[in-house]
Amino acid sequence: MGRILKAILGQLSFFTIIPSPSASLEEIAEFSFISPLMVGIITGIIDWFVVLLGIRLIGSLGALLLIPTVEIIRGFHHLDGLLDMGDALMVGKERRPQVLHDLQTGSGAIGLFLVYFSIFLIATLNLNVSNLWFFLPSEVLARASAISLLGLMKPIPGSYLGKVFHDKMRDKLFSIKFLLVQVFAILFSSPVLILAYVILLLVFYLMAKLVFDGMSGDIVGAIITLSFPIYLLVAEKTCYHYFIFQYSLTLP
């Protein structure tokens, strides 16, 4: 198997628990710009199928199956990053890099988890129908947000994963890689979703810059985790593909 194909397929094994050929961290980092599209599409299809099956089997509450499905597919790794970031937000700036890497769970982690879970719960309870165009852009945008900032911002001290990904992204092809990530981000998105993407990208950039002064693997996981239900909520209300389909059903 070619090195490039192996590195591309390795995105799945790195960002999810989906079985796929593994690659070195450096190879995965070098081609991480493809992960929003590749991983996003596959996980988006899984999300859609689970919600579709859940709604058909047990009614609208079947959409709640999306919450454990998303976390299981991610192997709970991104959720761990969210919890670590929650704890880090509660301490002084000097201790934040250290808290990001410790194994303890404090009140900050619980608080940020409750914020995330509340948004996700609202988003799933609003799902009266399983439409693929709700899930594809949400998965792709969440990952594009994190990968974009990983390339733009320097790693925080002590973040080996952040340094490897940043260095591999910031090569001579960085402009092309960054542009491709943005193309992937808007590929399945409505205008309102694109606006939400720009706003969240700015919010997360300012947070990472002012609070942590850089990026790390935990912050990447936190961004993917927290932004996904927000994008999903926006997609449910603004997905023009869905509304065009609904309108077409009313035509004679």
From Swiss-Prot:
Pathway: Cofactor biosynthesis; adenosylcobalamin biosynthesis; adenosylcobalamin from cob(II)yrinate a,c-diamide: step 7/7
Transmembrane regions listed in the UniProt entry: 33-53, 105-125, 132-152, 184-204, 215-235
The protein's name: Adenosylcobinamide-GDP ribazoletransferase
Reactions catalysed according to its record: alpha-ribazole + adenosylcob(III)inamide-GDP = adenosylcob(III)alamin + GMP + H(+); alpha-ribazole 5'-phosphate + adenosylcob(III)inamide-GDP = adenosylcob(III)alamin 5'-phosphate + GMP + H(+)
Keyword match Transmembrane helix: yes
GO molecular function, one term: adenosylcobinamide-GDP ribazoletransferase activity
Gene name in the database record: cobS
Biological process annotations from GO: cobalamin biosynthetic process
Membrane topology label: Multi-pass membrane protein
Protein role: Joins adenosylcobinamide-GDP and alpha-ribazole to generate adenosylcobalamin (Ado-cobalamin). Also synthesizes adenosylcobalamin 5'-phosphate from adenosylcobinamide-GDP and alpha-ribazole 5'-phosphate.
Assigned keywords, A-Z: Cell membrane, Cobalamin biosynthesis, Magnesium, Membrane, Transferase, Transmembrane, Transmembrane helix
Main localization of the protein described in the UniProt heading: membrane
Keyword Transmembrane annotated: yes
One Pfam family in the UniProt entry: CobS
Intracellular or extracellular location(s): Cell membrane
Annotated EC: 2.7.8.26
Class of the enzyme per the UniProt entry, highest EC level: transferase
Source superkingdom: Archaea
Cofactor section: Mg(2+)
PANTHER family: ADENOSYLCOBINAMIDE-GDP RIBAZOLETRANSFERASE
Gene Ontology cellular-component annotations: plasma membrane
Family of this protein: Belongs to the CobS family.
